[in-house]
């Protein structure tokens, strides 16, 4: 599996056509770029949204080709915006990502409420290319933009009692119309152990493909934990709480026999209704083998030494 590579080139993370067009934009300068947009119009399939300044780029997907923008932003699970894969992109316009604040509470020495833009200024974003494996046995490769969750945790100074970190999604039935239906117990909550939250791979994402997160992908702030199934990645986060005891989490409460608290990608532990041994990479015809911990076993397996991963799925 590919190791940390701080020298990854932009071309490696971006499909060639998009890479070349981005270089064309930069060569023209601001005024020329505006003219180019007017002349050509918006092109389907290209990243949209505000461009983000990225401090560095790191490929942690073993050189695998990133999933196209259209698929990453058009095939989503975000029940707050609808339960079909296409609903989130159709309904994302109702989500207002600014102004936005995140409340930090619980077992920390520095509880506070942070503006999301101030948060980004504190921690310069970097691009990380990660595999993403859904519990539904499909997967993508996504060039996220964000900062290590561990950096925020350290700044907040958790107390010695803090053993877990919970992440809560916005509760607003106007902005997130899917919350009008009781398909899940709202608001959505997910959580990590404190050692998982401080692992270098855990990311708070603010963008993808060099652009601000679209609403359907969890704007303006979402959790990315690449060795776990995608439902662990809380979207549109408004509250982060440090806790002494393991909290209730949404899918684990709704269907504990199907959605474990740990949710580590494990090809040897099947979902009750389907196998987890193989997965369908979006955009590919044939299914591929699922890797333990989604290919990140060398980095994260020591976190679970001595833990029965069949029982603690």
UniProtKB/Swiss-Prot annotation:
Which family, according to UniProt? Belongs to the MsrP family.
* GO BP annotations, alphabetical order: protein repair
Cofactor dependence is on: Mo-molybdopterin
Q: Which UniProt keywords apply?
A: Metal-binding, Molybdenum, Oxidoreductase, Periplasm, Signal
What job does the chain carry out? Answer: Part of the MsrPQ system that repairs oxidized periplasmic proteins containing methionine sulfoxide residues (Met-O), using respiratory chain electrons. Thus protects these proteins from oxidative-stress damage caused by reactive species of oxygen and chlorine generated by the host defense mechanisms. MsrPQ is essential for the maintenance of envelope integrity under bleach stress, rescuing a wide series of structurally unrelated periplasmic proteins from methionine oxidation.
Q: How does it assemble?
A: Heterodimer of a catalytic subunit (MsrP) and a heme-binding subunit (MsrQ).
* Pfam families listed in its UniProt record: Oxidored_molyb (PF00174)
Q: Which residues form the signal peptide?
A: 1-44
InterPro entries in the record, alphabetically?
MsrP, OxRdtase_Mopterin-bd_dom, OxRdtase_Mopterin-bd_sf, TAT_signal
Q: Describe the processing and modification events after translation.
A: Predicted to be exported by the Tat system. The position of the signal peptide cleavage has not been experimentally proven.
Q: What domain of life? A: Bacteria
- The name on file for this protein is Protein-methionine-sulfoxide reductase catalytic subunit MsrP
Binding of Mo-molybdopterin, residues: 76, 79-80, 134, 169, 217, 222, 233-235
Kindly indicate whether the keyword Signal belongs to this entry: yes
| Reactions catalysed according to its record | L-methionyl-[protein] + a quinone + H2O = L-methionyl-(S)-S-oxide-[protein] + a quinol; L-methionyl-[protein] + a quinone + H2O = L-methionyl-(R)-S-oxide-[protein] + a quinol
Q: Which organism is the protein's source? A: Anaeromyxobacter sp. (strain K)
Q: Does the keyword GTP-binding apply?
A: no
- Gene Ontology cellular component? periplasmic space
Where in or outside the cell is it found?
Periplasm
């Amino acid at each position: 599996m590919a190791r940390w590579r701080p020298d990854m080139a932009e071309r490696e993370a971006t499909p060639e056509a998009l890479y070349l067009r981005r270089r064309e934009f930069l060569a023209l300068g601001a005024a020329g770029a505006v003219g180019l947009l007017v002349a050509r119009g918006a092109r389907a399939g290209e990243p949209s949204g505000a461009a983000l300044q990225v401090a560095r780029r790191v490929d942690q997907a073993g050189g695998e080709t990133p999933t196209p923008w259209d698929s990453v932003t058009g095939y989503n699970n975000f029940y707050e915006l609808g339960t079909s894969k296409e609903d989130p992109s159709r309904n994302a316009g109702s989500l207002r990502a600014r102004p936005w604040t995140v409340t930090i509470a619980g077992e920390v020495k520095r509880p506070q409420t942070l503006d999301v833009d101030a948060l980004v200024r504190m921690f310069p974003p970097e691009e990380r290319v990660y595999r993403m494996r859904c519990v539904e046995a499909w997967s993508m490769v996504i060039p996220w933009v964000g900062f290590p969750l561990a950096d925020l945790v350290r700044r907040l100074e958790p107390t010695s009692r803090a053993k877990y970190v919970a992440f809560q999604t916005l509760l607003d039935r106007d902005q997130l119309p899917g919350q009008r239906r009781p398909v899940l117990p709202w608001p959505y909550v997910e959580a990590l152990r404190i050692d998982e939250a401080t692992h270098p791979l855990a990311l708070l994402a603010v963008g993808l493909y060099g652009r601000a997160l679209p609403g359907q992908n969890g704007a303006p702030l979402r959790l990315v934990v690449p060795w776990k199934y995608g439902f662990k990645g809380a979207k549109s986060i408004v509250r982060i709480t440090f806790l002494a005891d393991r909290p209730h989490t949404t899918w684990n409460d709704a269907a504990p026999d199907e959605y474990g608290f740990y949710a580590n990608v494990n090809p040897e532990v099947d979902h009750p209704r389907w196998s987890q041994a193989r997965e369908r990479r979006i955009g590919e015809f044939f299914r591929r083998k699922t890797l333990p911990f989604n290919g990140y076993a060398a980095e994260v397996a020591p976190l679970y030494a001595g833990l029965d991963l069949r029982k603690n799925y």
